[in-house]
């Protein structure tokens, strides 16, 4: 069903009543949908670099408007090819009893703009000027005005946009996350041994996740990994910290008011296999769901197919120390510093065997996608259960070589084989090994049968409030033009309906 109403008063008033019907003991995988890798968005573009749908660098469900949003990142060029950054509004059929999803449809594509100029995925140039360079990775809708708040990896940045995608303001960034080579801002430098970056966020490891408190007063931006200074350099080689940072921002002022330490999974002393966080989702004013993943799974080179690890954990900021002025380097935190508390057991395992073997996931051939990056809690189900939606970033199913030549990446779910071919033409294909390395150019010839572009993936999970210790949605307290209905109507939803709001544009 496409739930027809989004009701602030209803959501707030009947949440306790609805939650009484939730009886399952743990989150349950319901089903998945796979979306063809060649699908276009509604921007009007028809090529890979201006119109191919960029999948879910983040997801957000707006309960005030009953709308789903998906974020595209900096584009297929990895920061080397011009791409107008954008946001997608989409629909899903949601079975009100089971939470099963179907019929993914794009309804609206919004470009991010600063006046007449679009924010672009090209890397900053010159390297000390951020300009309109933008690599969107985290998304929320502000409950008090409906604006979009988007986090970025280049800066890192936190920008507010209005409903048309027009830039409103930039939040102030603390000094310790700004990338510097010595005293000079440098948005493209890398740490040792190859580069000169000495402090701030690592490149391509900026604000990967973003969450909003239920009342909209605070936004929480999370670095994919810790800062350069949180790591260590030994023998000229940089090693990341086992800790990363959650930054708390006051949305009224745009200023950071605290930072918290979050420990990644693993024995250390440094995270392995590219481990970092991909998403953060608020459960209430103190508790969050954080998605961690490694760099293994079905993806473009250099993704290794072996041993993907993608899990979401419940965390609590209550009692955590503000580490705004504390280094997170070393095997342990300084005496007296308390990190966020983290449930030792994952709430969900996105690549559990039972998930990958489900018939709805046949397009993956029993193998897990590399980049799970989006999490959102959707509409309540008819018994009061919560629906959790998870989504992947397929990198547009595009890769490129050192000279900037792009290739489409194709996947065979039966064999698990991958090949890369001429862009938008399945010719001159080259093999990709299980470990992600690329063979001799053209060693496969034209695209063999059984291959298709890497799909985007959405999965639905059903869970009770008890599974997550309760949930408070970001519901607006500002009156608006949305239709009202009673709690009885919510309990009576049992047919597939299309949301009239979701059909329209904002």
Regions inferred by a protein language model and the residue ranges of each:
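Bacterial N-terminal signal peptides that target proteins for export
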Residues: 1-10
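Sequence/structural signature of beta-propeller domains
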Residues: 25-475
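C-terminal membrane-anchoring or membrane-association module
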Residues: 493-506
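Long, low-complexity, Gly/Thr
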Residues: 13, 24-25
